[in-house]
Amino acid sequence: ETIRPEAEVVSRDMYIAYRSATSIAEGQTVTLFKYVANLSSMDYAFDKIEAAARDSALAAQAKGFAQLLAEQAAAWAAKWEGCDVSIEGDVAAQQAIRFNIFQMNQTYTGEDERLNIGPKGFTGEKYGGVTYWDTEAYGLPFYLKTAEPHVARQLLVYRYRHLDNAIKNAQKLGFKDGAALYPMVTINGEECHNEWEITFEEIHRNGAMTYAIYNYINHTGDRDYLAEFGLEVLIGVSRFWRQRVQWSDRRKGYVMLGVTGPNEYENNVNNNWYTNLLAQWTLRYAAESIAFVKASHPQRYAEISANGNSIVSAINR
């Protein structure tokens, strides 16, 4: 028997709820079904989102719990089919790896290029759901191995859409000519971090952006991505590295002073090995990518050739 008791709205500061009551006989049970719609103003105008949420919740109610459960189970079964890891002889490890696989797949689906991966996933509140360079270093490889290529591609497109803000971030620190510094912490491409030794010095994050492009193309063979999106990012980051290094007469080579490595054990050090290596590698990879796009996508190359040639000249010197 379905019962629909009257519901009273309970509302106070930062709190809203329904309160309802019903009578049952001894031995009877009541099952409560709650249908909730979670929509974002990223997708709906503010004055329309309430009505859209109501329609969505009512549509879910019309389907009913059993059908919704079946649809959810089928979706997860399809997901697990391509990403499960089976470990024999170690129950704890098996449980742990499947827990993490579940969290990764629940956190990101690749359906919306405006979204990214929060450091604590979908269920953790710490860090407020912002985006770190950890996405490229640790998140992207998981999706490359377990999901369709477009899922990882969307993570790269997310960074491409933030390129203009990365250039503005670099300009605030005195860099010019289209040099790009991707933020340590962000939601929309603007820097959201407030500790100077991290924000200004942990610049290895730029290398994570460029290596992610290489990693994606190496796994998928989608070299068209370079022409469409990737090359512009490589050029912007390469311009940053070109301006960030300085010549040392004593060392007879370029140095990079005042940086913090990814382990954050030491701040404000000179010539962090990881950072220097990624900077050098990025410049070489950018030059190779420019040559590839010039040969394979001449029209696209013509659109960005001025930027590209400036990078080639810098590398040749």
Language model feature labels by segment:
Residues 108-123, 149-211, 217, 224-228, ...:
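Helix-terminus loop motifs that line ligand-binding clefts
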Residues 81-86, 103-106, 137-149, 197, ...:
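Well-ordered alpha-helical scaffold segments within catalytic/enzyme domains
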Residues 190, 240-310:
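Acidic/histidine-rich catalytic neighborhood
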Residues 89, 123-133, 193-206, 263-276:
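Solvent-exposed loop and edge beta-strand segments that line ligand/cofactor-binding
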Residues 96, 148-162, 225-241, 293-317:
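Extended, well-ordered alpha-helical scaffold segments
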Residues 1-127:
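Acidic/polar, glycine-enriched structural segments that form the non-catalytic walls/loops
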